[in-house]
Amino acid sequence: MKKMFVLGAMLVALVAFQPAESFAQKKGKWVTLFDGKSFDGWKKWKGGEITKWAIEDGAMVLTEKGGGDLLTVNQYGDFELELEWKISEGGNSGVMYHVQEGEKYCCPYSTGPEIQVLDDAKHPDSFAGKDGNHKSGSLYDMLPPNDLKAVKPAGEWNKMRLVIKNGKGESWLNGKKVVDFPTKGPEWDAMVANSKFKGWNGFGTSDKGHIAIQDHGDKVWYRNIRIREL
């Protein structure tokens, strides 16, 4: 009995002293969202053939304006998303989550909150908004990144990580957590009310939806896209 008690105490101590991690610590299996060879698992916003998006060296590339936003075929609730992005000089794009479809919505950002992808140095949107909340890694028009130097310049690859779990979100950029944010509740409602999205019916109200990649008219690359549900 004494030995069992000692063993139990040791196990409790080991658990208590496990290192702290992101709240995405307990995870499911990683699933590749883009195989680098085809657009399997993706579709065009409002339907139709995927054009003006190409695949080059294992990356999906918006080659010219008019390709339209791309959505995952599947929908996700709580998840961890990882990808790499590279923006052209003066370019703009973004990644949205919990996107809803429907004729009443003009575009994915009508419903899906956006993590900004931008040439912070040269795109004018970088200098708009408030306190940097239009810069790369920001929760667009709501919360700025806490480190404006985390982003790499246009033409270089950046690594994004987005975690959504239990009403909370994290935006990571190149290994640094740059934004913590609620995804629901009074604090979220206040953030929306103080943003351009005030009064947008359906914006940020869903607990599940598509992942979307934005065509903002500028050349942009995405690769190594994977997700796991939490």
Segments from the language model and where they lie:
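Carbohydrate-interacting regions of secretory-pathway proteins
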Residues: 22-230
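Bacterial Sec-dependent N-terminal signal peptides
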Residues: 1-25
